[in-house]
Each structure stands twice: as C-alpha cells, then as structure tokens.
Amino acid sequence: MKKVRLTREGYEKLKQELEELKRKFMYEISERIKEARELGDLSENSEYEAAKNEQGRVGSRIMEIEQILSNAEIIEDSEEGDEVTLGKWVTIRNLDTGEEHKFRIVTPQEADFFAQKLSADSPLGKSLLGRKVGDIVKVKAPGGVQRYQVVEVTNR
C-alpha cells in the first residue's frame, strides 16, 4: 500500500480512535454478545444480531485505521510562508460576497468540515494548493463559479 500522508494532529487522532475502538471491541461489544447469548435462541435474537453487526463494523474500522497508521507519513509543519501547502491554515475571501473563511488544508482521511479541515483533494483544496497570499482562484460550484482570494497563510 502506498504511503498515507497525515498531519501530526491527524495521526494522533487516529491513534486515539484506534485505542477507543479496541477497548470497545474487547469489552463492551464482547459483553453485549455474551449477554445476548444468555437470552436463548440466537435465530430470533435481535440484541445478538445487533451486537454481532457492530462487532463486524468496529473490527473493520480497526483494521482500516491500523493499515492507515502503518503506512502513515507524517507531514510536519513547514516553514512560515505565504504558499498554501498541506497542513497550512488558509484564510480566503469570497470575492462576490466578501465573506471570509479559514480552514486547514489536510488529507482526505482528516477532512472535517465542522472542524475547519478542508481536503486537499476537494475542488477548492486542489485550486488552493501552491497558491500564495493575494492569488485569486476560481472554483466550480453547483451555483456557478466562485472566486476566492487568498488572504492569509499560516502554520497555526
């Protein structure tokens, strides 16, 4: 498998999720399966079925995270500069509305709109990579082409 680029923060977050899932997998789900078995006939036991389904889902996620972490390449903060690169925080201004938005450019595995983390593989992320403060980018959106200006680029 090829290397998976992650920020230090993203790597640590995945490690934490893995620990929590393993704990859940080892204790909570196993206990639920045990309790459901004690209820008797497994063919019509919805608690048992639900616990087994969750066990499969959690087990799959554990394997996925372990694979990502074993192939992870940590992206360290680069030197301060005004170029948009992976891991940098960027502030952009919508040239039509004047609204400003700040987010961090991250890998697809770390993308989280609500945490202000924009995937470098998204249309906006792709258009911003390599750009500098003052540059203007155009992005196709469902409502038409949006124009943004890079206002600020920082490590934090």
Swiss-Prot record:
PROSITE patterns per record: GREAB_1, GREAB_2
Record carries keyword DNA repair: no
Gene3D superfamilies, sorted: Transcription elongation factor, GreA/GreB, C-terminal domain, Transcription elongation factor, GreA/GreB, N-terminal domain
InterPro entries per the UniProt record, alphabetical: GreA/GreB_C_sf (IPR036953), TF_GreA/GreB_CS (IPR018151), Tscrpt_elong_fac_GreA (IPR006359), Tscrpt_elong_fac_GreA/B (IPR028624), Tscrpt_elong_fac_GreA/B_C (IPR001437), Tscrpt_elong_fac_GreA/B_fam (IPR023459), Tscrpt_elong_fac_GreA/B_N (IPR022691), Tscrpt_elong_fac_GreA/B_N_sf (IPR036805)
Origin: domain of life: Bacteria
Keyword Repeat: no
Name used for this protein in its record: Transcription elongation factor GreA
Its job: Necessary for efficient RNA polymerase transcription elongation past template-encoded arresting sites. The arresting sites in DNA have the property of trapping a certain fraction of elongating RNA polymerases that pass through, resulting in locked ternary complexes. Cleavage of the nascent transcript by cleavage factors such as GreA or GreB allows the resumption of elongation from the new 3'terminus. GreA releases sequences of 2 to 3 nucleotides.
SUPFAM superfamilies given in the database record: FKBP-like (SSF54534), GreA transcript cleavage protein, N-terminal domain (SSF46557)
GO molecular function (one): RNA polymerase binding
GO terms, biological process: DNA-templated transcription elongation; regulation of DNA-templated transcription elongation
Residue runs in coiled coils: 1-32
Pfam families to which the protein is assigned, alphabetical: GreA_GreB (PF01272), GreA_GreB_N (PF03449)
Keyword annotations of the record: Coiled coil, DNA-binding, Transcription, Transcription regulation
Protein's organism: Thermotoga neapolitana (strain ATCC 49049 / DSM 4359 / NBRC 107923 / NS-E)
Family stated for the protein in its record: Belongs to the GreA/GreB family.
